[in-house]
Each structure stands twice: as C-alpha cells, then as structure tokens.
UniProtKB/Swiss-Prot annotation:
Family as reported in the entry's similarity comment: Belongs to the archaeal/bacterial/fungal opsin family.
Subcellular location: Cell membrane
Propeptide feature ranges: 1-6
Entry protein name: Archaerhodopsin-2
Keywords: Cell membrane, Chromophore, Hydrogen ion transport, Ion transport, Membrane, Photoreceptor protein, Pyrrolidone carboxylic acid, Receptor, Retinal protein, Sensory transduction, Transmembrane, Transmembrane helix, Transport
GO cellular component term of the entry, any: plasma membrane
SMART domains the UniProt entry points to: Bac_rhodopsin
Amino acid sequence: MDPIALQAGFDLLNDGRPETLWLGIGTLLMLIGTFYFIARGWGVTDKEAREYYAITILVPGIASAAYLAMFFGIGVTEVELASGTVLDIYYARYADWLFTTPLLLLDLALLAKVDRVTIGTLIGVDALMIVTGLIGALSKTPLARYTWWLFSTIAFLFVLYYLLTSLRSAAAKRSEEVRSTFNTLTALVAVLWTAYPILWIVGTEGAGVVGLGIETLAFMVLDVTAKVGFGFVLLRSRAILGETEAPEPSAGADASAAD
C-alpha cells in the first residue's frame, strides 16, 4: 500500500485532531457494551432484574452517543484563557457524565435499598460535582479554574462519603450476594472516579502536564471501565434478581462456594 495514501487516510480519520482515534474506539466499545447488555437481558422476565437492565443499558447507550458526537467534532468548544492559550473543551463529555453518573449511583442505591431522600441527595451532589467541573473547564483564569475544580472535588468526596456510609450500611443488612456485589461495585467506583479529578488537574483543562491525545485516551479507558465494566459486574450477579430467575453467580460467589 502506498505510504502516502495510508498517511492521507489516517489524517482524514483524525481530521487534524489527535484525539479522534480514541473517541472512535470509545464509541465502538460503548456500543458493544450496550448491545451486549441488551442481548443479555432480552429474555429476562424478573421485574427487579428488568429495572437494573433498563438503567444499566442506558449508561453505555448515552455514552456512545456522546462519544460519537465528540468523534464528529460536536460538543466541543474553544476557550481562550487569560494567558492567550486556546483550549479545546469537550463539553459533551460533561453532558455524558451528567446523565450517566446518576444512573450508576441509582444502580447502587437500588442494591442497597435506601430511601428516596438519600437517593435524591446523592444524585443532587453528583450533579453538582459534574456542573462545577464543567464551569471550571470553561473558566478563563487559573484561579477560577482551580477553584471550581476544588469545588467539584469536594462534591465528589461527599458522594464517596455517602457510598461508604449510608449506602454501605443499608447494603450490609441485605443478603450476602447483595453485600458482595455492592462492595465490589463501590470499590470500582471509588477507584475509577478518584482518577477523574486527578486526570483533570494534570490534563489540558488543568496544569497541562499531558496533552489532549493522552488525556482523551485516559478518559476513554476510565469511561469504558466505569460504565461497561460496572454493568458487566452488576448484571452477572444474583443480587439484581427476585425469586424467579438467576444469572450465573458472580466471581465472589463462586469463590465462596469453592471454599
């Protein structure tokens, strides 16, 4: 194959944006996750399980739409900083998070069987976390950007606090399968979500230690793991079901049975 033609095709794919490749891969992986969850839940009749499937299918479904939009250059704007530097800010990513992170938290809240006030508080603080992060990304001065980042990070810590206290206490009163699944998913959320503010602060929206291409790759890996990986663990667990049917046991349940 002609190297010049190959390079021209690669340049066309990237459209002058080094992050386009990762956005395309992210779109594909989110779509695969969406259709896998749809196929897995197609014949499920258990009422509780259908609720979890409906919520969990929406998560990568929404994310795939956001990633496809970003792939085509939609949902991105230029922000000129006070220093004169111009940044590409993908606000579509924040729109994705604003819808998908509450759904992930709703899955956890349903597992723990907490009251509506707790669910509303948790989702409200989560929305505050996302919105203040977006305001920080759109701000033009370092002081404003880092102040809003701090505000968003504090909101995240409150979300984490709720997960590790109120929701965990409620989940502890339920079955062993529910406790095991809840603890696994909470650990996954705690680790992955902690990486987001760190990546924000070292990425182009913060200190600029890493470039947009690497930043987009890292966000894509985090997003796919936090959404598709979360759903894979949840939907394989007996914890989502009532009395009528059960999928294959989770890895934690298999290990316990072997003991």
